[in-house]
UniProtKB/Swiss-Prot annotation:
This is Archaeal histone A. It comes from Pyrococcus furiosus (strain ATCC 43587 / DSM 3638 / JCM 8422 / Vc1). GO terms for cellular component: chromosome; cytoplasm. Keywords: Chromosome, Cytoplasm, DNA-binding. Pfam families: CBFD_NFYB_HMF. It is found in: Cytoplasm; Chromosome. Binds and compact DNA (95 to 150 base pairs) to form nucleosome-like structures that contain positive DNA supercoils. Increases the resistance of DNA to thermal denaturation (in vitro). Homodimer or heterodimer with another histone. Dimers then assemble into higher oligomers, with the DNA wrapped around the protein core. The lineage of its organism: Archaea, Methanobacteriati, Methanobacteriota, Thermococci, Thermococcales. Residues 20-22, 54-57 are annotated as: Interaction with DNA.
Length: 67
């Protein structure tokens, strides 16, 4: 884990209205976002394989998010 950079996550929290963000808060959110993204990606891969494809397409990602 820990592949997402902290700075963009910090900016996301600030976009949500925070004036200041602790490094630990940004790290925790980054970890959660990474875990969520991996789960979405795994589902998308399953959908692509079920469709007989090796390539994950936008529709696979959208379907994975909805499921």
């Amino acid at each position: 884990m820990g592949e997402l950079p902290i700075a963009p996550v910090d900016r996301l929290i600030r976009k949500a209205g925070a004036e200041r963000v602790s490094e630990q808060a940004a790290k925790v959110l980054a970890e959660y976002l990474e875990e969520y993204a991996i789960e979405v990606a795994k589902k998308a891969v399953e959908f692509a394989r079920h469709a007989g494809r090796k390539t994950v397409k936008v529709e696979d990602i959208k379907l994975a998010i909805k499921s």
